[in-house]
């Protein structure tokens, strides 16, 4: 029986294939935010919140700090939309923090003056309604809270924020699908990507959790189970009962995902990317999750509050199986992942904090020109790696050498940075670049000593 290899793929694994990096998506979101604001004739809230977060981070001391990217700002949009919902449906901290006043530097074109809104609310609490259940229409211009005759009024700011957020998520889904339609499988990078995953599958029973929306892993391993049946319907019972792995699960959504109908909330699987897709649309009703926060009904997960976003299928069950498979795995390979998703990091940390034996963990990453040895790194990526696996950067070394290794030199020599005590190996030459060391990687994941990672060992 083959050993089980759990593979977790982040954005860096598919950027050599023409898929966007996180900074690429940052720029796209900025452009789409301006497009939305121009179309609506209002403020680009994504851009404003980006500037606000950037200013906040810069006001702190130098040193490690949270990453500012599109996902952070999308999460802020969710939080602000909840903050701007009128009582009693919004965030109670707004009353404690600022006496119920809105943010002073943000402008919402369709929000009535705060003093009038508060007077209305105090005058008639019976008019308070949940927008989730009391909205109609497909666009902002048609969304009408039950107690209002137009989108202006108590819910104006909330509607604007959710409208732009839905627009951005829909644009992201469409953009990723277009890139996958244009994907060229004949490139050298695509061939090496396929050889890497197929080589792993020959030796192991491989289960892949793709944190990206692209179809790169599916293209490399056609026939892998996705969690959806022949007719495109989600199959929870099959997922739960499946003993064989050989799957590619898209934990955060896929370009193959579509809402079953334009105003439905069930996600189905479209085999061909040329079919018609429904990715959610701005202005439609939203789904309430924990603490009353609203989230757009869409085909993918992006932004903050991911545990809330994971509460709907297929994401809910796929996350549950990730936790299960972390415990079942005989070895783990992580490719191009920035360790920025707490729900993934925590699943790993819970498994590795038990102290009941270490399994091999191979991390395939692309180091920058100025990246230092793990022993001297204090950036968030290195800190999260050590936290997830209960390791310490000072234990990492190049097999057969004593001095702390420089990642650029390791890549040039075709070797790894290894923590022998915790059985963690880091390849700094990129996901696709690791294909040239595939035999050694396979042997090491299968339990061989660290020596197989030394180039002159014949691997």
Features from the language model and the residues they span:
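A short acidic-Thr-Gly-centered motif at the start of a beta-strand
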Residues: 1, 192-203, 318-327
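SIR2/sirtuin-family catalytic core signature
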Residues: 1-17, 22-54, 241-244, 313, ...
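Intrinsic disorder/low-structure terminal segments
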Residues: 45, 69, 107, 276-277, ...
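Extended, H/D-rich, highly charged conserved domains that either
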Residues: 46-174, 181-189, 193-298
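Generic alpha-helical structural element
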Residues: 185, 206-209, 311, 333, ...
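A Trp-anchored, charged/polar loop motif used as the substrate-binding/catalytic surface
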Residues: 187-193, 232-234, 307-321
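Gly-rich Lys/Arg/Thr-decorated short loops/hinges at beta-loop-alpha junctions or inter-strand turns
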Residues: 298-304
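Glycine- and acidic
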Residues: 304-308, 329-331
């Amino acid at each position: 029986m083959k050993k089980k290899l759990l593979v977790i793929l982040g954005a860096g694994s598919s950027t050599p294939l023409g898929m966007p990096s996180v900074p690429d998506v940052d720029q796209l979101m900025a452009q789409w935010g301006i497009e939305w604001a121009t179309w609506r004739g209002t403020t680009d809230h994504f851009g404003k919140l980006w500037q606000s977060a950037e200013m906040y981070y810069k006001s702190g001391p130098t040193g490690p700090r949270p990453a500012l990217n599109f996902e952070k700002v999308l999460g802020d949009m969710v939080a602000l939309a909840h903050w701007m919902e009128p009582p009693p449906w919004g965030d109670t901290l707004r009353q404690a923090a600022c006496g119920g006043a809105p943010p002073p530097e943000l402008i919402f074109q369709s929000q009535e003056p705060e003093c009038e809104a508060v007077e209305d609310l105090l005058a008639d609490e019976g008019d308070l309604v949940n927008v989730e259940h009391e909205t109609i229409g497909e666009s902002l211009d048609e969304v009408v809270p039950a107690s209002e005759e137009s989108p202006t009024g108590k819910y104006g700011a909330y509607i604007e924020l959710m409208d732009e957020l839905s627009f951005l998520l829909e644009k992201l889904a469409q953009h990723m699908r277009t890139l996958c339609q244009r994907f060229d499988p004949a490139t050298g990078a695509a061939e090496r990507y396929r050889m890497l995953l197929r080589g792993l599958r020959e030796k192991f029973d491989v289960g892949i959790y793709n944190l990206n929306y692209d179809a790169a892993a599916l293209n490399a391993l056609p026939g892998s189970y996705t969690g959806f049946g022949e007719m495109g319907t989600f199959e929870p019972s099959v997922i739960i009962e499946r003993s064989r792995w050989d799957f590619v699960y898209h934990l955060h959504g896929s370009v193959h995902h579509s809402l079953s109908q334009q105003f439905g909330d069930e996600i189905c699987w479209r085999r061909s990317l040329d079919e018609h897709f429904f990715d959610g649309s701005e202005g439609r009703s939203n789904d309430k999750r924990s603490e009353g926060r609203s989230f757009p009904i869409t085909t993918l997960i992006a932004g903050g509050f991911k545990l809330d976003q994971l509460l709907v299928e297929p994401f809910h069950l796929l996350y549950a199986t990730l936790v299960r498979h972390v415990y079942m795995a005989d070895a783990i390979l992580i490719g191009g992942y920035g360790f920025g998703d707490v729900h993934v990091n925590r699943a790993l940390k819970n498994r590795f904090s038990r102290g009941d034996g270490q399994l091999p963990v191979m991390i395939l990453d692309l180091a920058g020109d100025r990246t230092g040895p793990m022993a001297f790194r204090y950036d968030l990526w290195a800190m999260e790696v050590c936290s997830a696996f209960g390791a310490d950067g000072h234990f990492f070394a190049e097999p057969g050498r004593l001095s702390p290794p420089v990642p650029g030199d390791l890549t040039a020599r075709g070797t790894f940075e290894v923590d022998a005590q915790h059985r963690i190996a880091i390849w700094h030459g990129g996901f696709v670049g690791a294909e040239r060391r595939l035999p050694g990687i396979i042997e090491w994941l299968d339990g061989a000593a660290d020596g197989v990672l030394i180039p002159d060992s014949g691997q």
